[in-house]
Amino acid sequence: MICLSRSGHRYLRRVHNRVCSPLLIERSIKMALALSLLLFFPTPGTSSSSVGTKLSPFPACSITPSFEVSRIMWYVSTRGMAPRVDFEGALFSGYAPDGGLYMPEELPQLGGETLRQWSGLSYAGLVKALCSLFIGPELIPKDDLNDLIDRAFSRFRHKEVVHLCRLRNGLNVLELWHGVTYAFKDLSLCCTAQFLQYFLEKRKKHITVVVGTSGDTGSAAIESVQGAKNVDIIVLLPKGRCTKIQELQMTTVLRENVHVFGVEGNSDELDEPIKAVFADVAFVKKHNLMSLNSINWSRVLVQMAHHFFAYFQCAPSLDTHPLPPVEVVVPTGAAGNLAAGCIAQKMGLPIRLVVAVNCNDIIHRTVQRGDFSLSETVKVTLASAMDIQVPYNMERIFWLLSGSDSQMTRALMEQFERTQRVNVPKELHSKLSEAVTSESMMDEVITQTMLRCWEENQYLLCPHSAVAVSYHFQQTDRQQPSPPRCCLAPASAAKFPEAVLAAGLTPDTPADILALERKEARCTPMRKGDDWTQMLRDTIENLSRQWQGHFQNTPE
C-alpha cells in the first residue's frame, strides 16, 4: 500500500485540528484528494517523496513565441507550492496538493500568421490544434490525440459540433449545446473522458468517478463515460430539485458502469457524504476515486476553442494588421469559460471579453469594484446553472493577470477561504478590468430578453444564453459603437421549459427529450435517516471488487 509522506500526514493533522470555515474544510478535503491521486498516478515531474514538502515558488508563466512539438508541457499550481506535473498529472489531480489549480507553465504566443492559418479550421480542428500545444506527443501521440477528439465529438447532433446562428441587428449566437445532453458541458467532458480512458487503458487501471450535481454536470458526466470499461461513475442528484428533463437524462442511462442515487435533500446536503468519502485519503487512494468538476484543467483547455471559433466566425477580415477585435460575451457561473477566454486572449487572440452573470453577482462585483466576497445566500434564478457562490476558476484568472504571481494568488485565495471575503489589490483589479467587462441581469431582464429575441428572430434562448444576449440588446439600444459581437449560448432552451413558459413563450421539446419519459429509469434512493456516507462507501467498495479481476488495480 502506498502511504502519505510524514509531511503529508502532518498537514492533514493540522487541517483536522484547526477551526476552519466551511470553504477551508472543503478545500482541505480536495487537497487531500489531490495528494492521493498524485501518488497513485505519478508523472515524470513528480515523486511521492516530494508530496507534502514545501517547495520554492515556480517561475512565472512565460509567453513562448514558438513551441517545439517535442517539448514537454509542464503545469504548475497557481499557489506555487506544489510539484509541477505533466498533462496526465493535471488531468487526474484536479486540485494541486497545495490547494491551487493547475495552469500551463508556459503559454505559446500565436501570431497573426498562425491565426490566419487556423481561421479555416473546423471547431474539432481547433480543439485538436489547441490540445496539441498543451498535451505533449510523449504522452499522447498526435494521431492518437486526433482520434480521441474525433471519437469525443462523434455523438454530437450538428455536423459542425458547434454552430453560429446569425440573427437580426448583429446578434450572433454561438450554440454550444449540440451534444447529447443539450449543454455546453458535453464539449469539454466528452474530450476529458476520452483522455482519461486513454491513460487508464495505457496504465491498466480503473477509476470510480463520484459526482454531486444539481443537474447539467451529472448528465454530461454520465454521457461522457457511459459504457467505458475502465470507469464507473456514481452520481448523487437532489431528488425533485432538478428539472424533470435533467433528472431523466441521468436516471434513464442503464449502462452497467452508471450508478445514480436520488438524495432526499438539497445540493449542499448531498455534498456531505461525498466530502466525507474524499476526506478519507487511504480510501480514495485504494479505490482510485476522482471527480469530474469544473476546476479540471482539461475542461478549461477544450473550452478555449469556443473563443477561437467565435473569433474566426465573427471577425470581418483577417487581412488587416493588427487583426480586428471581436467582443465575446460569456455567461458564466464557475468562470471556467471565462478563464479559457482569458488564456486565449493572453495567447494573442484579439478578443474583448464580457462576462455576463445573473443576480448571483460575485464575478460582476469583482470586475467592477474588486469585491471578491460571498453573498449571504445563493439566490434561486431562472438561470439555475449560474446560481453559484464560489467561482473557483477566478483563481486561474487572478494568477494569469498578475503575471503568474503565485504568492499573491495564494494569499488572496487563503484569505478568501478563511473570511469568505477579499479585496482584490488595486494593480490586479486594474488588469482585470482591462481584460474583462461585466454585466449582471435579474430574472425580469432574462425573461424580457427571451421574449424579445423570439419576437425579433423567432429564436428561443435558454435563460443562460439570454443573460448574454441581454448585454447585446443593451449595447444596440444605446447605439454604442462596438466591434462584431458573439454571444455564447451554453444550453438549449429545450432543457428549460419552465423558463420559456415564464417568458410567455411555448417550449419546443425535441423528440429525443420527449422520449425520455417513455424510457425505463433506474435510481437508488438515499432517504432521510439513511447513512448516506456508508451507502456511498459500500457502493464504491463493491465496484472495486467487481473490477479487481479485470484490472491490475490492487494497491501495492
Which residues does each predicted region cover?
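PLP-dependent amino-acid enzyme catalytic core
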Residues: 8, 40-41, 52, 57-556
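Hydrophobic alpha-helical signal peptides and transmembrane signal-/tail-anchor segments
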Residues: 34-40
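Intrinsic-disorder-associated, low-complexity terminal segments enriched in Asp/Asn/His/Tyr and depleted
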Residues: 9-11, 16-17
